[in-house]
Amino acid sequence: MKTLLYIGMSLFFIIGVVLLFVMENQRSEAVQKEMKMEMPKEEMNLRKATFAGGCFWCTEADFEKLPGVVKVISGYTGGNKENPTYTEVSSGTTGHVEAVQVYYDPSKITYEELLDYFWKHVDPTDAGGQFVDRGAQYRSVIFYHDEEQKRLAEESKEALSRSGRFQKPIVTEILKFTRFYRAEEYHQDYYKKN
């Protein structure tokens, strides 16, 4: 009787392990499939740029108008809180800014063109926010993903400073990109929904 009990328990354990493995494998395949659906094959050669220009609703809408920009995602970056919420970022205590992640086709639009567009849609002399949105979470920042983006961002900022277009100094920060947290779904394509 004990032998049958041990065999039954062993079989139950083995079946449980196999089921867990199968379920985890299916979940992993589903996640991979979802990622592929989110980024079609022809979009795998896209480049990424990250900008903070005040309220991400407006910044997202601005960049989505550009030919060569494939996708723009609103989110949070630059701070120290993992997985922040809109309420937390809005409080100004996380160090994050509202930002957009721009996926673009470099054969249709260059990073330099994105920078030029960015400068035309922010007040680069205002460290306290952008337009009616006040607070450090609304300041303008260019987040670079590699040394080439850093160089181009610094050169464009210097050119803007020399242009004489602004009386005050350019205070937009240029910071190394660390991590981007996608904003809640109701913030995505906000201008289309409202």
Feature annotation, model-predicted:
Residues K2-N194:
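Flexible coil/turn and secondary-structure edge motifs
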